[in-house]
């Protein structure tokens, strides 16, 4: 048997090598809490002392929750998803992450939920990164004044309450007054800009549906697809059947997707339809979390809910890439009461409002824009120069017409000048009507408004005004294509351009046949000037 030799130096070297190369496994540390109360879309959790505000928590079945209330002994969180499987006593773990959404160009043409997951059955979306939902809005020094037009395609809006890129313009009115139609038509009106392929003209659109019926969201998607506008639009859907937490988060998801594009130097249009339902969802969540109620039972921070959302819409400075995000929030009123809590809050945050009135809508005025209290505080500097030139007196003329109309209702005898003004006002009201899904190009709007305000349509019967306008524009595009192009691409119209338009209108009038079979100019009353 060989003799066993022990060499102390070998043992020492082996121990030294082991000690030097030894790396202890870090003990895994995970905070796990317990559900103490669950129901109605919220949960109370104990045992997570290090949780952050707005941190995502993970329940046993994989459902996520958002920590909103950080109290001394427990956390109040809103459940993001199906809450029927969450029960008292179940474990809850921290994720260490705040709520974020994936961002990418692949969102265009898709329908997603408030967590950014596709729900249109068209497969996964390739993403390029993530963006936190709660991010600071651009600072004053990162912004630039609004100076580029964002045309809606509606004469009444583009002429009297113009919108610029980076502006927040509120669309407010009772239910069934055409608020969503105005927003959807604005998206459709960006189609020609998108097809130019010019990044400075292209506008990416985001439609955030909050608390809408599923059928309504489907019809909006169908209208966009039918009109060729879905390819540059993302729909963030939180239908009425979704939990309150999803309706509360949906606008921030849409805003985060849009901000990513804005900081890349692109132009974005985002529509929140509508913020009244988001405020209602936030009120429900806050009351369930036992937050103290304020006016109309809304929590004290409901103003901050909307201000921090809408302040993200901006026109960035050249140093930041010169991108923009234009916001069109929609708010529903009750019985035309714009002095209620949420409407006054959002009016004070935004840069103007388009007030749609149910009486005008029922009278056949579409869009039902109340010119008296609709205003754009910054859009005038962004308005197309030609439109600004021709629409200057339109608002005043319409306001005077409404006063005169109310006076004439008493059957008083009017002088010739008042009768002339009344007749022209009736024609202008008729001229400003537009059908849904038929937005007009800038040059068409300019010609129509100029012809109406300068009396070029005074001899046209009121019943024929819309047909006259349609056929006139078709004639101009057919016979005077160069003239229409110069109006679109030029700035303020020169005297020569105005003269050419006047001559073209005069030539068309000679061949226009009214509904009673007469040609204009034959036995037509002289136009009152």
Swiss-Prot record:
Recorded hits in InterPro entries, A to Z, give: ATP_synth_asu-like_sf, ATP_synth_asu_C, ATP_synth_asu_C_sf, ATP_synth_F1_a_nt-bd_dom, ATP_synth_F1_asu, ATPase_a/bsu_AS, ATPase_F1/V1/A1_a/bsu_N, ATPase_F1/V1/A1_a/bsu_N_sf
Which GO terms fall under molecular function for this chain's record? Answer: ADP binding; ATP binding; proton-transporting ATP synthase activity, rotational mechanism
Q: Does the keyword Ion transport apply?
A: yes
Reaction catalysed?
Answer: ATP + H2O + 4 H(+)(in) = ADP + phosphate + 5 H(+)(out)
What's its membrane topology?
Answer: Peripheral membrane protein
Site positions for Required for activity: 374
The organism sits in which domain of life? Bacteria
Protein name, UniProt field = ATP synthase subunit alpha
């Amino acid at each position: 048997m060989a003799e066993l030799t022990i060499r102390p130096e070998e043992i020492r070297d082996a121990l030294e090598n082991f000690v030097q190369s030894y790396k202890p496994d870090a003990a895994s540390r995970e905070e796990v809490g317990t559900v103490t109360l669950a129901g109605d879309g919220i949960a109370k959790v104990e045992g997570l002392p290090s949780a952050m505000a707005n941190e995502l928590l993970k329940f046993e079945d994989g459902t996520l929750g958002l920590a909103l209330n950080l109290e001394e002994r427990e956390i109040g969180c809103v459940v993001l998803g199906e809450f029927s499987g969450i029960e008292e006593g179940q474990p809850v773990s921290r994720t260490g992450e705040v709520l974020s959404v994936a961002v990418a160009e692949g969102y265009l043409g898709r329908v997603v939920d408030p967590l950014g997951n596709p729900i249109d059955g068209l497969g996964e979306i390739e993403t390029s990164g993530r963006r936190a939902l709660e991010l600071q809005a651009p600072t004053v020094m990162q912004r630039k004044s609004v100076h580029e037009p964002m045309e809606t395609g509606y004469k009444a809006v583009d002429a009297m309450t113009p919108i610029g890129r980076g502006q927040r313009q509120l669309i407010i009115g009772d239910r069934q007054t055409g608020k969503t139609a105005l927003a959807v038509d604005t998206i459709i009106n960006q189609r020609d800009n998108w097809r130019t392929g010019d990044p400075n003209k292209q506008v990416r659109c985001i439609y955030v549906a909050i608390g809408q019926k599923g059928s309504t969201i489907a019809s909006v998607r169908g209208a966009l697809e039918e009109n060729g506008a879905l390819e540059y639009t993302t729909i963030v859907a939180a239908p009425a059947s979704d939990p309150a937490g999803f309706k509360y988060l949906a606008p921030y998801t849409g805003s985060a997707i849009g901000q990513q594009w804005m900081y890349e130097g692109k132009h974005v249009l985002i529509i929140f339809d509508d913020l009244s339902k988001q405020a209602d969802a936030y009120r429900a969540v806050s009351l369930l979390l036992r937050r103290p109620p304020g006016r109309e039972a809304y929590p004290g921070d409901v103003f901050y809910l909307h201000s921090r959302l809408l302040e993200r819409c901006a026109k960035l400075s050249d140093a930041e890439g010169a991108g923009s995000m234009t916001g069109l929030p929609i708010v529903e009123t009750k019985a035309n009461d714009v002095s209620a809590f949420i409407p006054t809050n959002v009016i004070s945050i935004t840069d103007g409002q388009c007030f749609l009135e149910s009486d005008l809508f029922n009278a056949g005025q579409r869009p039902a824009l109340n010119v008296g209290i609709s205003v754009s505080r910054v859009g005038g500097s962004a308005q197309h120069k030609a439109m600004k030139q021709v629409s200057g007196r339109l608002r005043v003329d319409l306001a005077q017409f409404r006063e005169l109309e109310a006076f004439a209702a008493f059957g008083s005898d009017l002088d010739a000048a008042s009768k002339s003004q009344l007749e022209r006002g009736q024609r202008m009201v008729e001229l400003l009507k537009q059908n849904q899904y038929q937005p007009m190009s800038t040059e068409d709007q300019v010609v129509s408004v100029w012809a109406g305000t300068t009396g070029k349509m005074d001899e046209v019967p009121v019943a024929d005004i819309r047909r006259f306008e349609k056929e006139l524009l078709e004639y101009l595009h057919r016979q005077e294509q160069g003239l229409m192009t110069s109006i679109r691409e030029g700035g303020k119209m020169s005297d020569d351009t105005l003269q050419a338009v006047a001559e073209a209108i005069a030539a068309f009038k000679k061949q226009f046949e009214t509904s009673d079979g007469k040609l204009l100019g034959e036995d037509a009353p002289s136009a009152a000037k």
